[in-house]
């Protein structure tokens, strides 16, 4: 996978065959031309999109940048209207990063992060709905009337109904990131690919925000 920084004007890349300068994410398939990659993406029936919480905040760094989220919704709608089944996993970094807190127990810190992803999914889901898409939010733990409990059968039913399915709450367990969560859900849902929008421009051997020598 190739990671590109999300900002205003990004595009859903090859999935919708739309190209804007500074696209946010895409699938890189080795030894294939751009045309072949785009054709491959168009053949994919079900994809999972992973958005970092920081990506939703835009230049604000915290909370939500509504223009950015609306642009995400616009691009996803292109894919949905083309017949692609889209699932969404969102991080919680625009509200909370448990690994950066030394004051509380790691398990509790990660639980706060899981709840942050639920808030993000509720917000983004409503923006998606404002464009005419139908959505459902699933969590691996009960959240009252706000979400529905995840099951593979339930998610598949929503996909078949043409709904965008939000997978909130990560894996439901501490010590696992939402990047792990999207990989888990992709396997369970038999997705054709994962598309990631991250706040970094590549895959590194250590955190480039901390280690300037990261490779």
Regions found by a protein language model. Name each.
Residues 50, 99-107, 142-164, 174-215:
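Active-site phosphate/oxyanion-binding loops
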Residues 80-82, 122-131, 184-192:
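Alpha-helix C-terminal capping segments
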Residues 5, 20, 33-39:
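Polybasic, lysine-rich low-complexity intrinsically disordered segments
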Residues 96-119:
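A charged helix-plus-loop insertion that forms the helical arch/lid used to bind
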Residues 40-85:
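N-terminal glycine-/serine-/threonine-rich phosphate-binding loop
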Residues 48-52, 90-91, 138-139, 167-170, ...:
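Short beta-strand segments
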């Amino acid at each position: 996978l190739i990671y590109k920084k999300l900002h205003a004007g990004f595009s859903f890349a090859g999935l919708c065959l739309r190209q804007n300068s500074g696209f946010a994410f895409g699938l890189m398939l080795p030894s294939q031309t751009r045309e072949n990659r785009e054709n491959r993406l168009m053949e994919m029936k079900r994809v999972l999109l992973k958005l970092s919480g920081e990506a939703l905040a835009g230049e604000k760094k915290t909370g939500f940048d509504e223009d950015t989220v609306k642009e995400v919704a616009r691009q996803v709608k292109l894919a949905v209207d083309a017949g692609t089944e889209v699932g969404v996993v969102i991080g919680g970094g625009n509200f909370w990063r448990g690994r950066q807190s030394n004051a509380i127990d790691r398990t509790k810190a990660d639980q706060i992060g899981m709840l942050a992803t639920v808030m993000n999914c509720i917000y983004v889901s409503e923006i998606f709905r404002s464009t005419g898409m139908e959505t459902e939010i699933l969590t691996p733990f009960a959240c009252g009337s706000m979400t529905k409990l995840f099951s593979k059968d339930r998610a598949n039913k929503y996909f078949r109904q043409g709904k965008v399915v939000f997978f909130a709450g990560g894996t439901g367990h501490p010590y696992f990131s939402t990047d792990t969560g999207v990989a888990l859900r992709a396997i369970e849902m038999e997705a054709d690919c994962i598309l990631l929008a991250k706040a970094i421009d590549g895959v590194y051997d250590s955190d480039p925000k901390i280690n300037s020598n990261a490779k």
